[in-house]
Amino acid sequence: MTLNLCVLTPNRIVWDSEVKEIILSTNSGQIGVLPNHAPIATAVDIGILRIRLLKDQWLTMALMGGFARINNNEITVLVNDAEKGSDIDPQEAQQTLEIAEANLNKAEGKRQTIEANLALRRARTRVEAINVIS
């Protein structure tokens, strides 16, 4: 038995295929989803989506927050942005992380600090999506 996973952003369909299992980052921690999972709707945190493909290979995806619905072996993940780990340029991601860290260090005031922290979380997630060992 398999799951049908659909990952959507406002601009495109990132993934729409059958999978064996996923591990999803939610606002209350990671959840694993196997076939016949109980129905659930949950907020999706900035984090990694791990997808176990039908050939037992693992694929990673960086998700930038949103929500997910699981029902009758159908998983729909709606997020602000998503990138497959294999599509992320490692050098660009590392540079973005370094810039985000520098921006956090020089942030002044609450608003700049919050925005810099959010940018740093996004940058770390992109780097993590590249470096996850399958």
UniProtKB/Swiss-Prot annotation:
Assembly behavior: F-type ATPases have 2 components, CF(1) - the catalytic core - and CF(0) - the membrane proton channel. CF(1) has five subunits: alpha(3), beta(3), gamma(1), delta(1), epsilon(1). CF(0) has three main subunits: a, b and c.
InterPro entries reported for this sequence: ATP_synth_F1_dsu/esu, ATP_synth_F1_dsu/esu_N, ATP_synth_F1_esu_C, ATPsynth_dsu/esu_N
Protein name: ATP synthase epsilon chain, chloroplastic
Keyword tRNA-binding listed: no
Gene Ontology terms: biological process: proton motive force-driven ATP synthesis
Keywords for the protein's UniProt record, in alphabetical order: ATP synthesis, CF(1), Chloroplast, Hydrogen ion transport, Ion transport, Membrane, Plastid, Thylakoid, Transport
Domain of life: Eukaryota
Cellular component annotations (GO), alphabetically ordered: chloroplast thylakoid membrane; proton-transporting ATP synthase complex
Subcellular location: Plastid, Chloroplast thylakoid membrane
Protein function: Produces ATP from ADP in the presence of a proton gradient across the membrane.
Pfam families in the record: ATP-synt_DE, ATP-synt_DE_N
Family affiliation: Belongs to the ATPase epsilon chain family.
Main location as per UniProt: plastid
UniProt topology in membrane: Peripheral membrane protein
Molecular functions (GO terms): ATP binding; proton-transporting ATP synthase activity, rotational mechanism
